[in-house]
Amino acid sequence: MMRRYITALMLACCIGGYGQEKKQVTFVPPFDFPLTLSGNFGEIRSNHFHGGLDFKTGGVIGKPVRALADGYISRIRVTNGSGYVLDVCYHNGYSTINRHLSGFVSPIAERVEKLQYENENWEVEIIPEPGEYPVKAGQKIALSGNTGYSFGPH
């Protein structure tokens, strides 16, 4: 009797399991041309695993990078290793970190330059208030580049 009870309980646990509903999320592409990868996530590098996706830009610097969905700019950085970096939080719960950019768009570009002169330092970090720099899906947020520790435009 006990064996049947345990078997029935185990079957009920396996069949009736339901965690959470999968969200249906859509994104717009970050570029207005066909996407081709030049670097994959998890790819083995000389001293680490690659932590992102790199998209080819045809060897061109300065192509518009677009927001994938509605959201806001959550962090702005200029670093020696990653160059110009823009973090975006999207209202759908996802986020992106855009590295190696050639530049930012207005008004972020002006704010970064002002802070660089004030600090007399090329490396800066700005953490804006949530919603201070809102973005819409498809909006130009930066320019593709080759800054920092990068081996070609992407």
Predicted regions span which residues?
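Bacterial Sec-dependent N-terminal signal peptides
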Residues: 1-25
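Surface-exposed, glycine-biased beta-strand/turn segments
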Residues: 19-94, 102-107, 122-123, 129-131, ...
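Conserved beta3 VAIK motif of the Hanks protein kinase fold
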Residues: 98
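A solvent-exposed, charged loop/short amphipathic helix patch at secondary-structure junctions
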Residues: 111-123
